[in-house]
């Protein structure tokens, strides 16, 4: 796969040298893009990322589209100054269906691996959830701009929202993704953590 193709249209690459090493290895890579179906339609930003995922797909890599049906019910706190309204399971499923319809206008549906994070989170015990919290500290979470601002201004941050970045990072551990692509949001870089 041509390095220039991968780098084109990207603004920030975290671990650029590692990415280039993975691409030049010739190994088939698992490339993940996750979306939480919190509304009926995808955004223009999603379109850009789907095109990048398609480039990896066309180069023979595994394109993994993660539907964050579990995390959509929580709601991504990134950039929010208040708690997101909770969605029902039915709303999330309706939104997910339209997301897939829209995504497959770009991606090859036969070559796209669709996963839902409810597959693992619905099976997780409370003890497992608590054990997951050992991976990050409160101080690390408060480094996130969105949480920091809300904390300093005495605005509520629910425990569910506080766990969201950890939950989202765990998706990548479960999927064993080599590469993650996403819509530009520097606040979300805290949603990723390394496998141990």
Model segments located where?
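NTP-dependent nucleotidyl-transfer catalytic core
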Residues: 1-195
